[in-house]
């Protein structure tokens, strides 16, 4: 796919699609609640559609009426054994979170995915889940998919210290703990996105927090709700960066989720001196309108507890850093190596081929800026983030064509991406 390059400016207003993390969890909680839950602005990206289909295969009635998705919840006890293996597509979120849901069921199921997902280790989930009394196994010592799980209706509670800051592992254990007999305790390493915890409360459940400890009582039931999903800050990130680095630009993003565990990119933009304002802040919905304008940017350091709050945005933040004055250092981001690709190497290779100066490290990157960009041929390797990052980078390319291979990966999280990009050029 040939990408549009070297635009003069980007101007306009965009309402980004519903948050992917919240959309996944919406389908899960709606299925596990009793009654009909109605969701507005749910994402229809391929990953979320995978989660939706899996719960249909588990016996849940889900109706997509365009603006509204209705989930006819059956509770933990109402899920049915699937007739076939469960297809997770490319979604690491789906396979990890649903592992926790299936942990307390009295049937066996096998979960598989595409070639990319089949290379992603699942042992971070399988090891602690196995300690709760179920049987779960994958391929090789790292438990690559397919995963086969034989649940246990009499799950043992667990006390588990998370070895890494992973919201997916934490959430899988929470879903299992909700089905266990007694109290489970999960000890967090660092702050991670807390959508699962928030939604437990939204659906009438309870959690107790003590510092980095989360205490979960087993045997809880959830009540159907009506919920509006805020816009995905991970999707908004591409427009935030575009508005900051494309000359003469001003972009307004409406209804963007600003959950404090996800706003690391906003902290980075402030540290770099970007022109950004938040308005129409809704404290209850944790959303706001964000406006950005072309800015003179300075380098910064991105590390430590900031990393889990922007892990999915690091590819586009790397592009941002190529246009900042000075040397930006990203470290403590080894989690990027086990995304759809080795994201550290793939991002560095892609942007370097376009003229950037990036040194990949074991746990991050060193980015020297500002640098002019030019045309190149880039492969997404099936990673939607790489695709959208490249599309924004192409807007700065002065010479040569930018050709994107496997551009269809963008549909994983943002099917309307190019439509929205074109609207900013009009």
UniProtKB/Swiss-Prot annotation:
3-phosphoshikimate binds at residues 20-21, 25, 166, 168, 312, 339. One of its GO terms (molecular function) is 3-phosphoshikimate 1-carboxyvinyltransferase activity. CDD domains: EPSP_synthase. One of its GO terms (cellular component) is cytoplasm. Phosphoenolpyruvate binds at residues 20, 92, 120, 168, 385. Its EC number is 2.5.1.19. InterPro entries: Enolpyruvate_Tfrase_dom, Enolpyruvate_Tfrase_sf, EPSP_synthase, EPSP_synthase_CS, RNA3'P_cycl/enolpyr_Trfase_a/b. It catalyses: 3-phosphoshikimate + phosphoenolpyruvate = 5-O-(1-carboxyvinyl)-3-phosphoshikimate + phosphate. Its main location: cytoplasm. The keyword Amino-acid biosynthesis applies. It is an enzyme of class 2 (transferase). It is found in: Cytoplasm. Pathway: Metabolic intermediate biosynthesis; chorismate biosynthesis; chorismate from D-erythrose 4-phosphate and phosphoenolpyruvate: step 6/7. The keyword Transferase applies. It comes from the Bacteria. Keywords: Amino-acid biosynthesis, Aromatic amino acid biosynthesis, Cytoplasm, Transferase. One of its GO terms (biological process) is amino acid biosynthetic process. The active site is at 312 (proton acceptor). Monomer. NCBIfam families: aroA. Catalyzes the transfer of the enolpyruvyl moiety of phosphoenolpyruvate (PEP) to the 5-hydroxyl of shikimate-3-phosphate (S3P) to produce enolpyruvyl shikimate-3-phosphate and inorganic phosphate. Belongs to the EPSP synthase family. HAMAP family: EPSP_synth. This is 3-phosphoshikimate 1-carboxyvinyltransferase. It comes from Streptococcus suis (strain 98HAH33). The gene is aroA.
